[in-house]
Curated annotation (Swiss-Prot):
The organism's place on the tree of life at top rank: Eukaryota
Species the sequence originates in: Schizosaccharomyces pombe (strain 972 / ATCC 24843) (Fission yeast)
Protein's name in the database: Translation initiation factor eIF2B subunit beta
Family annotation (InterPro entries): eIF2B_beta_subunit, IF-2B-related, IF_2B-like_C, M1Pi_N, NagB/RpiA_transferase-like
GO biological process: cytoplasmic translational initiation; regulation of translation; translational initiation
Length: 393
């Protein structure tokens, strides 16, 4: 299915593509929720006769959405979760059908031998004229509450997936997508309740940027712990957001101080723990996060200060940082140097990266909605969440 066909067939997909390109929808959480809602509509509108057809449709829609905004990794992550969901539900349905078939066959074989001997030889020939595969297929469909098909050719193989026939997976898949949406809605709640295990009284915590997950994490711990928070402003892209978050933390009763990025290294020796948010977690355990966060992580490593990252599993992406330039999004340089300075602007190339990359060796712990894990354990979570065949959409 081509990109043009996808956009014309599903108006919701076309609308989300426009929102992604115009940055009307941005940020990992908003993109993840919108992607899940759109995919729920796609599944409800799509007609398919095989699981392969459904998977191809979902992959085509996912590929189109990812190309619309490649730096929004959560879009592709939700697509991969839905593909994994489809495969798991299909395998579970086949397993149930196979068990029912075996039960029917074993019950028919347990009939009395005397009844079998009373059957004339010509009747045996007539009964055995129908292939066993037809009988088993009919039994399976009858058990599933669907009419028996006329011919066994309806159960032919397409790729590695049998035609689902009467197996209606639509409701199960839509229910699974709704579970993903519900999980996204309570991500911060699942993470913030773990704060009591990681934050202690009289500690000095340093954070950078304006992560809502980190803010919820700190505010929850402040209900029973007394600690101080230092917020690095993240000039120039996150300056306003950092000041706004610091104000909210202060209103929650937390001793909060805002510092410039230039003083991070000098103050790091007094910091007990660094807590960061992230835009995405890559396949190698590295982070795509706020610009300037690598400076914080490098300073923390020099002073042997632990770096903790708060993130939902939906930000975990199997993409590897082979090409950092394609991953790091650039922002307008006007925040660094005004366009009014025409003479200097015409003679200089100014880059303003919106995101920064932190290697996995600079991170000590990931706190997710599933619990706390070291970077070396992320591959296990990734294998449990995504299918290896969906790494590239």
């Amino acid at each position: 299915m081509s990109t043009i066909n996808v956009e014309h067939t599903y108006p919701a997909v076309s609308s989300l593509i426009a929102d992604l390109k115009s940055r009307k929808v941005q940020g990992p959480f908003a993109v993840a929720v919108e992607t899940a809602l759109v995919m729920r509509q796609v599944i409800s509108q799509t007609r398919w006769s095989t699981v392969d057809q459904l998977i191809d449709t979902v992959r085509a829609v996912g590929s189109t959405l990812v190309k619309a905004q490649p730096t929004e990794f959560s879009c592709g992550n939700i697509i991969r979760r839905i593909l994994r969901l489809i495969r798991e539900e299909y395998q579970e349905l086949l397993k149930t059908a196979d068990e029912n078939e075996k039960l029917i066959v074993s019950s028919s074989n347990s009939s009395s031998p005397s009844q079998k001997r009373d059957i004339p030889s010509n009747e045996k020939l007539v009964q055995s004229h129908e292939p066993v595969s037809v009988q088993m297929y009919s039994s399976m469909l009858n058990l599933l509450g669907r009419p028996t098909l006329e011919s066994p050719t309806h159960s032919k193989t397409v790729g590695d997936s049998r035609v689902t026939g009467g197996m209606d997976m639509r409701a199960v898949i839509i229910s699974g997508i709704q579970d993903v949406i519900d999980e996204l809605d309570k991500i911060n709640t699942d993470i913030e309740v773990q704060s009591m295990d990681h934050l202690h009284s009289n500690e000095i915590i340093l954070t950078q940027g304006c992560s809502k997950t980190v803010e919820a994490f700190l505010r929850f711990a402040a209900k029973k712990r007394k600690f101080s928070v230092i917020v690095a402003e993240g000039f120039p892209n996150n300056q306003k957001g950092s000041h706004a978050m610091a104000k909210r933390l202060a209103q929650a009763g937390i001793d909060t101080t805002v510092i410039s990025d230039a003083t991070i290294f000098a103050i790091m020796s007094r910091v007990n723990k660094v807590i960061l948010g992230t835009h995405a977690i890559l396949g190698n355990g590295g982070l795509v996060t706020y610009s300037g966060a690598q400076l914080v992580a490098q300073a923390a490593r020099h002073h042997a200060t632990p770096v903790v990252v708060c993130s939902g599993i939906y930000k975990l992406s199997p993409v590897y940082p082979y090409d950092l330039e394609s991953i790091i999004q650039l922002s307008s340089p006007d925040k660094i140097m005004s366009f009014n300075e025409g003479d200097l602007i015409s003679r200089a190339e100014i880059l303003n990266p919106y995101y920064d990359y932190i290697p996995p060796d600079l991170v000590d712990l990931f706190i997710t909605n599933l619990g706390g894990y070291p970077p070396s354990y992320l591959y296990r979570i990734m294998n449990d969440t995504y299918d290896a065949s969906d790494t590239i959409l």
